[in-house]
């Protein structure tokens, strides 16, 4: 069985930023091009904002299995094969998120090597990396892999992840979607975008970040004192979910 333990520090840092995987849900259009209502956008913003309240991530939450683990573990192999056949010149990046203000992006690959082994790279503090190109790897199951291979690159929903990367990296001129499935007749497929190709998406990402920032700091929407009779703020000294899980296991109260 495929199994991978994700870096807990990286998982925790991600909860404080608007990432590529969440920003697509607050865009004015869906992945299929349909208009998204303002009510739906705000409902999705509330879901994303809830992650900003995360104080702790359990050890169990850091364990991935099946397709999720498979996809992560195959990333460096996919990049190596893409470099070999298409001369992309990419380096694998892992367990790091690049951030600026509220926007965050975790690169799979860039045209420069990863020199800092840290979960958080703050562009305002450390300066922006200057890759000429970036890469996003997708090691899907057979059906989704083949659908992606046959989808025109201008319609690939994964392009939004590249757009977030380019919004943060102003000097990046090219982005590559790398689809890899070692069991498929089409083992590897690469879709390359120029910055101009993603110009509209980059602009929409920047606008979505600005809208989310306004939503996040609107006390009328997020003021919990107005919606509850009582509430308690968590602290670092409070017992977390790992504590209770271990307690239940010792007391043989877990049905395992």
Regions found by a protein language model. Name each.
Residues 1-73, 224-256:
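Charged, glycine-rich intrinsically disordered N-terminal tails and low-complexity linkers that flank
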Residues 67-90:
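Acidic-basic catalytic patches of nuclease active cores, encompassing PD-(D/E)XK
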Residues 86-219, 223-226:
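Nucleic-acid nuclease catalytic cores
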Residues 41-45, 74, 78, 162, ...:
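Alpha-helical structural motif
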Residues 59-62, 73-80, 158-160:
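A generic short-segment signal for beta-strand/edge and adjacent turn/coil regions
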